Curated annotation (Swiss-Prot):
Keywords on record: Cell cycle, Cell division, Cell membrane, Cell shape, Cell wall biogenesis/degradation, Magnesium, Membrane, Metal-binding, Peptidoglycan synthesis, Transferase, Transmembrane, Transmembrane helix
Classification of source organism: Bacteria, Bacillati, Bacillota, Bacilli, Bacillales
Function recorded in the entry: Catalyzes the initial step of the lipid cycle reactions in the biosynthesis of the cell wall peptidoglycan: transfers peptidoglycan precursor phospho-MurNAc-pentapeptide from UDP-MurNAc-pentapeptide onto the lipid carrier undecaprenyl phosphate, yielding undecaprenyl-pyrophosphoryl-MurNAc-pentapeptide, known as lipid I.
InterPro entries: Glycosyl_transferase_4, PNAcMuramoyl-5peptid_Trfase, PNAcMuramoyl-5peptid_Trfase_CS
Transmembrane regions listed in the UniProt entry: 9-29, 53-73, 77-97, 117-137, 147-167, 176-196, 201-221, 227-247, 253-273, 304-324
Protein name per its UniProtKB record: Phospho-N-acetylmuramoyl-pentapeptide-transferase
Organism for this UniProt entry: Listeria monocytogenes serovar 1/2a (strain ATCC BAA-679 / EGD-e)
Length: 324
C-alpha cells in the first residue's frame, strides 16, 4: 500500500505537469512573460532572452495537488505535512512575486536583496514556530555518530540559516537549461528513499510528488529549454529540500545530497571575497561556477550532465550512509 501511494503520488504530479506545461507556455507567451538575460552574463545565453518563465506555477500546483490528495487518502496528514506545505507554497509565492516584478514591471533584478531576504526570514520563522509548537526534536546529529546536540533556542538560528541558505543556493544554481530540474529529481529521490526507510510516509509522499513534477517539467526545461521555472521554482525547491532534511533529521547529509548547490554558492562567495580582497582579481572566469566552465569552452549540456553526475554520486552515497 505504501509503495502504491508513492507511485501514485509521483504519477499524478508527473501527468498534471506534462499536460499543464504545454498549455501554459502559449499563455505566458501571450502575456509576454519572458526571461530577461543579464547583460553581464555569458554572451551565448542571449538567445535565451524571451523564453517563457514562471513555469514553476504548473509544477508547484501539480505537486501540491498530488501531495495533499494522497496525504489525505493515505491518512498521513501530520504537522510535517503542513511544514512542507509552508516551505513549498510560501517560498514559491515569494519567488512568484520576484518573477512578477521582473517580467511585468520590467525590473530585471526583481525584488531587492533586502526585500527577498526579509521574505525568506519571515517564512523561516513561521516554519520554526510550527515546528517548535509541535514538539519536534530541536537537536542536530553529529555525522557518523549517535550523538545528538540539543540546540534549544539556538535551533531557530539554524532554521533561518538552513532555509534561507538553501533557497538562495538553489536559486543561484538555476542558470542552465535543466540543471536544477535534474538535480531536484536526484536530490528529492534520495530524500524520498530515506524518508520511506524511516517510515515517514508523509515526507516520502511529498518527496515523490516533487520528483514527479520535476521529471515532467524537465521534459520541457532540458536544453534547449522551452520554458524556465523562474525564482518561483528555485526558491520553492530550495526551501523544500532544506525543510525535508530537517524533518528526516539528516541535515548534514544535505551538504552531500545537494553538493552542487553548495559548490555553486561557495564559488560565488569565494569570488566576491577574493575580488574585494585583491582589488579586482578573480578566481573563476564567472560565477556561479557553471558559467566558469561555459566560458572555458564546455557546452551547456556537458556542464549539466557533469553536474548531474556529481549530484547523483552524492545522493547515492548519502542513501547508503543512512540505510547501511
Amino acid at each position: 500500500m505504501s509503495l502504491y501511494m508513492l507511485v501514485s503520488t509521483f504519477a499524478v504530479a508527473f501527468i498534471i505537469t506534462v499536460i499543464g506545461v504545454p498549455l501554459f507556455i502559449p499563455f505566458l507567451v501571450k502575456l509576454k512573460f519572458g526571461q530577461s538575460i543579464r547583460d553581464e552574463g555569458p554572451k551565448m545565453h542571449e538567445k535565451k532572452s524571451g523564453t517563457p518563465t514562471m513555469g514553476a506555477v504548473v509544477f508547484i500546483t501539480a505537486m501540491l495537488i498530488s501531495f495533499l490528495v494522497f496525504s489525505f487518502i493515505s491518512g498521513e496528514v501530520s504537522a510535517a505535512t503542513w511544514l512542507l506545505f509552508i516551505a513549498l507554497a510560501l517560498f514559491g509565492a515569494l519567488g512568484f512575486l520576484d518573477d512578477y516584478i521582473k517580467v511585468v514591471q520590467k525590473r530585471n533584478l526583481g525584488l531587492t536583496s533586502k526585500q527577498k531576504f526579509l521574505g525568506q526570514v519571515v517564512i523561516s520563522i513561521l516554519f520554526y514556530l510550527v515546528y517548535h509548537f509541535n514538539d519536534f526534536a530541536e537537536t542536530l546529529n553529529i555525522p557518523f555518530t549517535n550523538i545528538e546536540v540539543d540546540l534549544g533556542w539556538f535551533f531557530v538560528i539554524f532554521i533561518l540559516f538552513w532555509l534561507v541558505g538553501f533557497s538562495n543556493a538553489v536559486n543561484l544554481t538555476d542558470g542552465l537549461d535543466g540543471l536544477v530540474s535534474g538535480l531536484s529529481v536526484i536530490a528529492f529521490s534520495a530524500f524520498g528513499v530515506i524518508a520511506f526507510y524511516q517510515e515517514q510516509m508523509d515526507v516520502a509522499i511529498f518527496c515523490f510528488a516533487i520528483v514527479g513534477g520535476m521529471l515532467g517539467f524537465l521534459l520541457f526545461n532540458k536544453n534547449p529549454a522551452k520554458i524556465f521555472m523562474g525564482d518561483t521554482g528555485s526558491l520553492a525547491l530550495g526551501g523544500s529540500i532544506a525543510a525535508i532534511s530537517i524533518l528526516v533529521h539528516q541535515e548534514w547529509l544535505l551538504l552531500l545530497i545537494g553538493i552542487i548547490f553548495v559548490i555553486e554558492t561557495a564559488s560565488v562567495i569565494l569570488q566576491v571575497f577574493y575580488f574585494k580582497a585583491t582589488g579586482g582579481k578573480r578566481i573563476f572566469r564567472m560565477t556561479p561556477i557553471h558559467h566558469h566552465f561555459e566560458l572555458g569552452g564546455w557546452s551547456e549540456w556537458r556542464v549539466v550532465l557533469t553536474f548531474w553526475g556529481i549530484g547523483l554520486v552524492g545522493a547515492i552515497i548519502s542513501v547508503c550512509v543512512v540505510i547501511f
